[in-house]
A protein has these predicted regions:
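A generic structural motif
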Residues: 1, 36, 111-112
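A short acidic (Asp/Glu
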Residues: 23-29, 35-37, 118-122, 152-154
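Substrate-binding/access-modulating region of protease and related hydrolase catalytic domains
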Residues: 81-165
């Protein structure tokens, strides 16, 4: 599979699991591995993050029925999690640093979230921090509405309860 080299396309920031640099579109992705070197990494740790970046880079080819005519985008991908278990506190700290050091990016994708439903009476701490980061940095987060792990889950999970984010499912 071949796609043209990037030229003047805008860059979207991705904060997710790891990225596999061996994929056909890797020329379009500037990858930063933020996971501690002492944490073991398995091949499965690269699957989700790579899939997210693939849709941003080559979505029209991978999902032609969803082609919106916007074309391809370059990606600056920050791998912040390996494995299914990660600390939301640690991820939020990393997000703050990543945003502060990448002021040129205005649109950020975050597909990491909880499979547990949000509380009916207040927004999550993670969502509140994302809202604060967006307001302070004039950016927008595109946040996954959370995958539905089973039929009993009806509501979104954190941080998809962010008020200022664009939430997609």
């Amino acid at each position: 599979v071949h796609i043209p080299s990037p030229s003047i396309e805008p860059t979207i920031g991705v904060i997710d699991t790891l990225f596999d640099i061996r994929v056909y579109f890797s020329e379009w992705v500037e990858y930063h591995d933020m996971v501690d070197k002492n944490i073991p990494k398995n091949p499965s740790d690269y699957r989700h993050g790579t899939a997210v970046s693939s849709i941003i880079v080559d979505g029209p080819k991978l999902n032609p029925w969803l082609n919106d005519g916007c074309g391809r985008f370059r990606v600056r991908h920050f791998g912040v999690a390996a494995g299914a278990q990660f600390s939301s506190f640690t991820i939020i700290k990393q997000i703050k640093c990543i945003i502060a050091e990448n002021k040129d990016i205005k649109v950020w994708n975050i597909s990491l979230g909880s499979n547990k439903e949000v509380n009916d009476n207040f927004i999550s701490a993670e969502a509140a921090v994302l809202d604060q980061i967006q307001a302070e940095n004039d950016i927008i987060f595109v946040v996954a509405g959370t995958n539905k792990p089973n039929e009993n889950i009806e509501k979104i999970g954190s941080p998809a309860d962010s008020i200022n984010s664009l939430v997609v499912n």
